UniProtKB/Swiss-Prot annotation:
Protein name, UniProt field: UDP-N-acetylglucosamine--N-acetylmuramyl-(pentapeptide) pyrophosphoryl-undecaprenol N-acetylglucosamine transferase
EC number: 2.4.1.227
Protein's cellular compartments: Cell membrane
Residues annotated as binding UDP-N-acetyl-alpha-D-glucosamine: T12, A13, G14, S198, Q289
Family annotation (InterPro entries): GlcNAc_MurG, Glyco_trans_28_C, GlycoTrans_28_N
HAMAP family cross-referenced by the UniProt entry: MurG
Organism whose genome encodes this protein: Streptococcus equi subsp. zooepidemicus (strain MGCS10565)
Gene, per the UniProt record: murG
Membrane topology note: Peripheral membrane protein
Keywords, ordered alphabetically: Cell cycle, Cell division, Cell membrane, Cell shape, Cell wall biogenesis/degradation, Glycosyltransferase, Membrane, Peptidoglycan synthesis, Transferase
Function, as annotated: Cell wall formation. Catalyzes the transfer of a GlcNAc subunit on undecaprenyl-pyrophosphoryl-MurNAc-pentapeptide (lipid intermediate I) to form undecaprenyl-pyrophosphoryl-MurNAc-(pentapeptide)GlcNAc (lipid intermediate II).
Length: 360
C-alpha cells in the first residue's frame, strides 16, 4: 500500500516554504502527497506553481483573533466547517501522518488528525507561538521549533532553522547572472539590499524614494513587491519579485536591510550576511518580529533599528555601526549552530513519523 502524507499551512509565504522543501523528498521516497489549504490562499498558488505531484484539497478557513469582534462568530463557524471537511478528507485518505507549517488554515486539519488518530507534526518558526499554533499544539504529536524556547512544554523539539540556503563559495554566480545590474553599480561603494514582506516592504520603498541621496553613498537593491517601481539606473536596482536571482542578489549585497521574519533572518544567517533588522512593530503584527530581532541582536548576529527611528541620520549611523563591527558579526554567525539542512530535518521527521506510527 502506498504511504500517504498530508501537508497543511498557509496564509503567508513563510507558512508554505518549508512544506515546498520537504514535499519533493517525500515524493522521491515513494510517498503519495496531499495538501489541505485555502483554495484562494498563497499555498494553493505555490503548489500549482511548483509543478509537484501533489493533490490539493480546499477547506473553509476563518481568521483567529485574540480580541473581540463580531467577525469571530462567523469565522468560528468557518473553522468548525473546516474541521468537518478535514475529517472527511483524512478519513478517506487514511494517511500515515500530517505535517503542518502553521497559519489559520492549518488548525482544522490538525484537530481532525488528532480526532482520527493520525500523528500530527507541526513547525513553529517564531520565538513565540502564534495563536494558530498555540491551538494546534494541544492536538499535535510533536512541535518542532526554530528558536530555543523558554517554555518547557513536553511536545517541543528544538531543531533550529531548516534552510537550503548556504554561505556563498564565490560571487561568480552572481556576477554572471547580474552583469546588467553590475554595469550600473560603483564597485567602490558598498551595496545595500532592502527586502521586506508584502506589507513590510512599503516602508523601505518609501524610504528609498524619499532619500535619493542614499545612492551617493551606496549601491541600492530594493526588492519592493511593487512592479510599478521597477527601475535600473545609476546605483539603483528596484525589482518587485525574484526567484532564481534571490540568492545571487543576496550574495551581491554587503549588507541586507530586512524585516524581522524568521525565515529571512535565518537565511541571512546561513549566508553569513551582515544584516540590519527593522522589525514590524506591534501596531502591524503580534510583536513576533520584535522578539525575533531581539533574539538575533542579543546573539550578536545583527543590529536592530526600530521603525519609528527610521530617519536618514539614524539609518546611516546604524549602517556605519554594522560595518565597523563586521568581524564580530561574521564571527558570531560562523560559530552559530542554529541551522539544519533540509535533508537532516527530513530524516528526523521520517524517524518521528515511523516511531509515532508504531505506537499507534
Amino acid at each position: 500500500m502506498t504511504k500517504k502524507i498530508i501537508f497543511t499551512g498557509g496564509g503567508t509565504a513563510g507558512h508554505v516554504t518549508l512544506n515546498l522543501i520537504l514535499i519533493p523528498k517525500f515524493i522521491k521516497d515513494g510517498w503519495e502527497v496531499h495538501y489541505i489549504g485555502d483554495d484562494n490562499g498563497i499555498e494553493h498558488q505555490e503548489i500549482k506553481k511548483s509543478g509537484l505531484d501533489v493533490t490539493f484539497h480546499a477547506i473553509a478557513t476563518g481568521k483567529l483573533r485574540r480580541y473581540f469582534s463580531w467577525q469571530n462568530l462567523l469565522d468560528a463557524f468557518k473553522v468548525g466547517f473546516g474541521v468537518m471537511q478535514s475529517l472527511f478528507i483524512i478519513a478517506r485518505l487514511r494517511p500515515k501522518a500530517l505535517f503542518s507549517k502553521g497559519g489559520f488554515v492549518s488548525v482544522p486539519p490538525v484537530i481532525a488528525a488528532r480526532l482520527l488518530g493520525v500523528p500530527a507534526f507541526i513547525h513553529e518558526s517564531d520565538l513565540s507561538m502564534g495563536l494558530a499554533n498555540r491551538i494546534a499544539y494541544r492536538f499535535a504529536t510533536t512541535m518542532y521549533t526554530t528558536f530555543e524556547q523558554e517554555q518547557t512544554l513536553v511536545k517541543l523539539k528544538h531543531v533550529g532553522a531548516v534552510t537550503k540556503v548556504t554561505a556563498p563559495k564565490s560571487r561568480s554566480v552572481a556576477s554572471k547572472q547580474l552583469a546588467a545590474v553590475s554595469e550600473y553599480f560603483d564597485p567602490n561603494l558598498k551595496t545595500l539590499l532592502f527586502i521586506g514582506g508584502s506589507a513590510g516592504a512599503r516602508v523601505f520603498n518609501r524610504f528609498i524614494t524619499d532619500h535619493p541621496e542614499l545612492k551617493e553613498d551606496f549601491n541600492i537593491i530594493n526588492i519592493s513587491g511593487d512592479p510599478s517601481l521597477n527601475e535600473l539606473s545609476r546605483h539603483l536596482y528596484r525589482v518587485d519579485y525574484v526567484t532564481d536571482l534571490y540568492q545571487p542578489l543576496m550574495e551581491m549585497a554587503d549588507l541586507v536591510v530586512t524585516r524581522g521574519g524568521s525565515n529571512t533572518l535565518f537565511e541571512l544567517l546561513a549566508m553569513r550576511k551582515l544584516q540590519l533588522i527593522i522589525p514590524l512593530g506591534k501596531e502591524a503584527s503580534r510583536g513576533d518580529q520584535l522578539e525575533n530581532a531581539h533574539y538575533f541582536t542579543t546573539r550578536g548576529y545583527a543590529e536592530q533599528l526600530l521603525e519609528q527611528e527610521l530617519t536618514l541620520p539614524h539609518f546611516q549611523e546604524k549602517v556605519r555601526e554594522v560595518f565597523a563591527k563586521q568581524s564580530d558579526y561574521l564571527s558570531a554567525m560562523t560559530s552559530s549552530s542554529e541551522l539544519q539542512s533540509p535533508e537532516s530535518f527530513y530524516q528526523l521527521l521520517s524517524a518521528d513519523i515511523s516511531s509515532a506510527t508504531k505506537e499507534n
